[in-house]
Amino acid sequence: MADLDDIKDGKDFRTDQPQKNIPFTLKGCGALDWGMQSRLSRIFNPKTGKTVMLAFDHGYFQGPTTGLERIDINIAPLFEHADVLMCTRGILRSVVPPATNRPVVLRASGANSILAELSNEAVALSMDDAVRLNSCAVAAQVYIGSEYEHQSIKNIIQLVDAGMKVGMPTMAVTGVGKDMVRDQRYFSLATRIAAEMGAQIIKTYYVEKGFERIVAGCPVPIVIAGGKKLPEREALEMCWQAIDQGASGVDMGRNIFQSDHPVAMMKAVQAVVHHNETADRAYELYLSEKQ
């Protein structure tokens, strides 16, 4: 029982000072529940509103691709330099130490491989397991215009509905079919559909013409995919252009772990995203850090 001795009435209520109601300023997320906003605040740095995610979930359909042969050797040293880790539950449980203390976005779609039609995915993770693993969001592909468009959209809807019950954000990842044109019109369509279905974060590709229109037409935060490996200077330029045109962060994989100096590249990307450094300045940082 609590000690009831020496209880004193409160006196300093500051009646002349109204309680502060601090708004949640992440784009399109002001009306979400406290738990979901809390998870989003771990993904997006509250001071900058941006994020640098490290994606190493490629094995769910590619297997042990270049740079991901040994997660424990090649990727683990990068954990401390990332804001967020994006991986599958299998890799999380088997390789990522719980003491890593980084927010995790769990890959939640799968059941396909590079040997078959990539757009034929199913939900590959229960929301109970996502909560059990203390993840901050789940992620699934959405393949607009593909053979399995309908199923991929249903996957997003299923995850959003399940996530709303437990305060778990869903990140929709815009996949591109073999014959799809990667242009502003396509990604404006894909990102908007995913947001309309309720996804709280959209991951999509940067395009040189009209990317700012993609961002403007999407009511929730957009993070860009790194895509195929580029020379480091080009990758940093892509990051800078995307952030300058309204992206809320990057989710990079191959342009980090396939770099000759992955830690230096992570630091350079962080400089662009969180410190507004130009691509030139960030590349200078990369060159200095790799020595």
UniProtKB/Swiss-Prot annotation:
Origin organism lineage: Bacteria, Pseudomonadati, Pseudomonadota, Gammaproteobacteria, Enterobacterales
Annotated compartments: Cytoplasm
Upregulating conditions: In the absence of AI-2, repressed by LsrR. Induced by AI-2, via release of the LsrR repressor. In the absence of glucose, induced by cAMP-CRP by direct binding to the upstream region of the lsr promoter.
Record has Lipid biosynthesis as a keyword: no
Domain of life, source organism: Bacteria
Family indicated by similarity: Belongs to the DeoC/FbaB aldolase family.
Matching SMART domains: DeoC
Catalytic residue positions: K203
Physiological role: Involved in the degradation of phospho-AI-2, thereby terminating induction of the lsr operon and closing the AI-2 signaling cycle. Catalyzes the transfer of an acetyl moiety from 3-hydroxy-5-phosphonooxypentane-2,4-dione to CoA to form glycerone phosphate and acetyl-CoA.
Protein name as catalogued: 3-hydroxy-5-phosphonooxypentane-2,4-dione thiolase
Key words, A-Z: Cytoplasm, Schiff base, Transferase
SUPFAM superfamilies: Aldolase
Principal cellular location given in the protein's record: cytoplasm
Enzyme Commission number, as recorded: 2.3.1.245
MF (Gene Ontology): acyltransferase activity, transferring groups other than amino-acyl groups; fructose-bisphosphate aldolase activity
Subunit structure: Homodecamer.
PANTHER family reported for this sequence: 3-HYDROXY-5-PHOSPHONOOXYPENTANE-2,4-DIONE THIOLASE, FRUCTOSE-BISPHOSPHATE ALDOLASE CLASS 1
